[in-house]
Amino acid sequence: MKKVNSLSGGKSSSYIAANYPADYNIFALVRTNDKSCEYPDKKIRQIVSDKIGMEFIATLEQDNIIKVMLDLEQFIGKEITWLSPKTFDEVINSNGTGKNGKQYLPNMMTRYCTTEMKIKPIFEWWQKEINEIVEMRIGFRSTEMKRAKTVMDKLNSKGIDEMKAVIGKSKNGNRNRWGMVEWRVPTFPLIPDNINNTDVFNYWQKN
C-alpha cells in the first residue's frame, strides 16, 4: 500500500513529512482571487503559480504557510505536490448557499470548505495519479485522540474512508452515475509514537 503524507502547512504535519518518509507528500492550498490580500513577494507568487499550474494571487491561510512549505520541500529533499484547482471565491460563488438559496451557517461552511478545498482536491489527485487504496498520514498529535476518533468513526466496516464520486455513466449515457469510492486508510503516526506539541516544537527549534 502506497503511503501519502497529507500536509497542512503546520508544524505537526511538517514533522511527519520530515520523519516519516512517504511515496507522496501532498499540500492543498486555499487560494483567493482577492487582490486586497495579495501575497507580497512577486517572486514567490510566481513560484507558487508554477507549482499549482495557475495564477496564484493570495491565500486565505496565513501567508507564512507558503514559505514554510517551500522550505519544507528543501528540508526533506523530496517534492511536495501542491494542489489548488479552485479558489475560495469560485467555491463560494458556485456552492455558497444551501437549499432555497439560504446561506450556510458558519460551522457548516467551515466543514464544506474543508471538504471542497482540502479533501476533494486530494481525492481528485489520487484518482488521477494512484487510484488504489493508500495509507494517508494525518498530523494529529498524541493529545488529539478525539480528532482522530472523529475521522475513524466515518470509515466503512473495512476501516477505509470513502468519497462520493462519479463511477461511470447511466445506461443511456446521458448522466453521470455516482457511488462511494474507497480511497484511503487514515493513520496518525504521532499518536502511537506519543509525539506531543512540545516534541514537535522542540524538533523545529533544533532544525
Which residue stretches match the model-derived regions?
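Nucleotide-activated chemistry modules centered on ATP-dependent adenylation/adenylyltransferase
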Residues: 1-207
